[in-house]
Amino acid sequence: SLLPTFVLIFEKREMDILEVAKRNQQRAWEVIMDTDIIRIWEGIGAEVNLVGSLSTGLLMRHRDIDFHIYSFPLEISDSFRAMSELAENPSIKKIECVNLLHTVEACVEWHAWYQDRENKLWQIDMIHLLKGSRYDGYFEQVAKRLLEVMTEEIRRTILTLKYETPDTEHIMGVEYYQAVIQGGVRNY
């Protein structure tokens, strides 16, 4: 019978997926520590919150680290000062800024690309928000709710879907969570 072989292969694949997730999450924390990003933003008086896949333990292959950073008042000069300090790190290869202060989002979007010791690029998204604005705490609450309902089966399913998604597809983390939790999706 092929069943024992199939079960063995399936269990190894599942362990591999969990190992990939664990390794990438460890690498993400190395990036955070090497850049000193939290201290940099706190140095301008901002509150720094990790959001996204890393905050929920669901970071897989997409090397992306997300922060929501809150200031009141939000002075664009302070935002640039923090990013100027971050840019001094030689592993930061590129930085982009989108000024959305005069929109309903009331934020400055920063995207930085960090090259790790294996020459892999990590995208660091830093959304600098006006404390008390429309999206203050929104994604932190999404992560909290996700962690409240996430079982080991849901976690493995989300990680598997993220692992199996082709690199050419761009699916937001929240779309995976909704598909699995609300839609019952179990495979790619």
Label each PLM-derived region with a short phrase:
Residues 6-51:
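Helical scaffold of the NTase/Pol beta-like nucleotidyltransferase catalytic core
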Residues 24-26, 30, 85, 101-107:
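P-loop/Walker A phosphate-binding loop and immediately adjacent motor/lid segment at beta-alpha junctions
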Residues 37-80:
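Active-site nucleotide-donor binding segment shared across nucleotidyl transfer reactions
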Residues 72-77, 119-120, 131-134:
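Short, charged/polar surface micro-motifs in flexible loops or helix N-caps
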Residues 79-87:
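Short amphipathic alpha-helices in soluble, non-transmembrane regions
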Residues 90-130:
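Conserved catalytic core of two-metal-ion nucleotidyltransferases
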Residues 124-188:
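Catalytic cores of NTP-dependent nucleotidyl/adenyl transfer enzymes across multiple folds
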